[in-house]
């Protein structure tokens, strides 16, 4: 006679339908971290691979990670806040922090336009793509008007716009901007994608 299968472990996440997953830490008034990641990497959505970096913060933050960079940032954010306000959850975060990696620039623009930068106590730009003029102009203006709450972690190539990359880095200054360079081990240089992804490891040090 075969042994009965063990019950599946309960899902530790709350699912924001069509938008992403929400982790709640034990302290109800912990800060809320809103994360929009980039394009698929090796066929894996950012809603999966961004948890590789965010899991280290689970004891200190409520964390939402979007399914992918194709979500509507406004709808995702509103879904999170609606979930937190439900009677059986009833959480009001002490502050809200916006984290944008790579292609997360786009849903980031959505939520910044609809909710305003003032909603967030901190805005982290992590090697975001700014290869279109409209995107570059948007984030230049954001840095001009909100430098005191922003950090910028970047590679030499991720922005796809060296002029805007340098403008934002200079606008924020050396204490708020970090240039991540490729590791070199002997004659072997770290692949560009590995350096790009490693900006997340560096960026979460600011949290």
Which stretches of residues belong to each language-model region?
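A domain-start/cap signature at the N-terminus of enzymes
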Residues: 1-32
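Active-site machinery of serine-nucleophile hydrolases
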Residues: 11-13, 27-87
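Alpha-helical scaffolding within the catalytic cores
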Residues: 19, 45-56, 79-83, 108-112, ...
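C-terminal catalytic histidine-bearing segment of alpha/beta-hydrolase fold enzymes
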Residues: 20, 151-207
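Alpha/beta-hydrolase fold nucleophile elbow
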Residues: 90-102
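Glycine-rich nucleophile elbow surrounding the catalytic serine of serine-hydrolase chemistry
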Residues: 100-110
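Conserved hydrolase catalytic core segment
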Residues: 110-121
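Active-site nucleophile loop of the alpha/beta-hydrolase fold
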Residues: 124-132, 154-158
